[in-house]
């Protein structure tokens, strides 16, 4: 009986103990980005099959949890998996994987984590590049990079803008940045790169970023990385864009009314005759009115009077205002004169259409990316347009676990037609001059070439125009040809070989051929070429480049120490060829705009060829401790064919360091501060972006009575050498409030020494001057780059950016 009671007591105790040990846990899972619930997140007791998912409110309940289970695992696609200690009531904040994934920058000869980078760089991604309909890929950087200045000179479609990074660094040498396309220096031109093919653009600004590119990187470097395929099923992307362009600039406040223009011109002449010539007010009144509409430009004559008024009266009254009896419109020499709006006639709404198709995919070993693009852009000025066809094929293959190779080839064909300069004439022509020729009934006259335009010459119209005579930019844009056609073939290949665990050898080879042909045909009917019976000039140029790189990388980590070393050699060869010829007296202007369509030679034929070579040895060492302290050293020894052999080699370096303060324990309590990083760099680079052969005397070959003769052209100076840029960069990077507010503030100081300038000498020496390293220049300023995200939900993200710089 006692045994039975004891057994019952034990069973009851065990049952009660088990019932008391079961735990129920409730909780909520939210996103760190927007504090919204994460719906459908998996919540699993670690080491068991006991799990559930969150409901529409992000809430979950787990029951029957054993006291031996201390941890739950929370996971969701696109978010960082978390292991959390079990509590009765839980609030779990999940972080997006894209948020914790550290940004990787494309830098000189490779990539670098943004946190480990000690230099100054800005990276733009494909989303920012393709969201705007830009013809030139570099236009996507407009307003995106602090310290980058972009200038468009004429607004022609297909125009290549000029770029400055942190100001002008030289007065004589070129100041444009180096373009690097997929790791290789690129000479093909911005327009030959289809923006739809671009994955990212990195702008490198300081010496720590650009020193490895040596002399060619002295003015900054812009690295363009094209898209690559990823393993997986084939993916086809089709993109079509249509847009319209109109004139965007606001007009200056200038006189547009013909009456107001005559009044202003009269007042100037009246004051001249009254004050400078000593005439009486009545005399000055008559002189100003008479000479204003006269044909002598030396006395202020405008030649054209487009108002009719009673005989015996003057156009401008003694009160300085237009005669109230004057009416717009006047017949002169069989033509009806009335002014036109030249500006409105010059511009029109231009249509733009762009189509892109790309196919990508592959296996774990081989991937392929292929693309085709077509662009047709009309210019806002009559006679201007741009047409482009692009194609790209990019492949990679993992042949062995230790060997990978690939190739990248692209082709671009473009045709650009430029306007005949109607912009300047439209804004420089007074509002009293007609654009068209009209008969006595006021109707625009016609000839075999369509509407007849007033060129301001009496043999083809009513009168001689003192301003821009024998010219009408709008009609010339319809007839004259300013055509550039180009073909660019660019290709590169690489092979990576990994050996001895931490070593990788890379061989890169890149070549490009850019072939361009420019044709300028001036019509024989009107304008300056009328007396020549038309003219034609043709220019052809070709640029061929070859770039070879051999790079050895070593990467090793031991404990909290990380070391990365790189050594390499690079050679670059550039051959430029140019051919030019011109003729007059064209036989059939519309049917044959070639040199064989003209019969009169101009003795203006020439050809030219130049070669430019560089060679460099490079080294970079990078070290960091615990992802907290960073140090970088770069060195390059460069040689350039643009200097005398005695001064051909130069040594350039950079040193950079960075410190991430938020990884220090004494900042752990500041929860709103996500990142605080200090960085500093200093370095020197050379600049050889000068003309060829400045170190030798040059001569012109002349025809002297059919005899060969030489004429002195330019005095050389064998002592010229590299312009040297010394760069200092000090910056701070920060992120606050879970990445809602981020940015950087940087101070830079760039000093150019041994700047190349022309040095004038007395003409008695037989020449006017020569080039020498005699100048200095200093650029310094502050760059601010801020980003704020006020709204970030699942469907809407609102970014506010602010960028500015001083110089």
Language-model-derived ranges and their functions:
Residues 31, 55, 182, 638, ...:
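Acidic active-site catalytic centers that drive phospho-/nucleotidyl reactions
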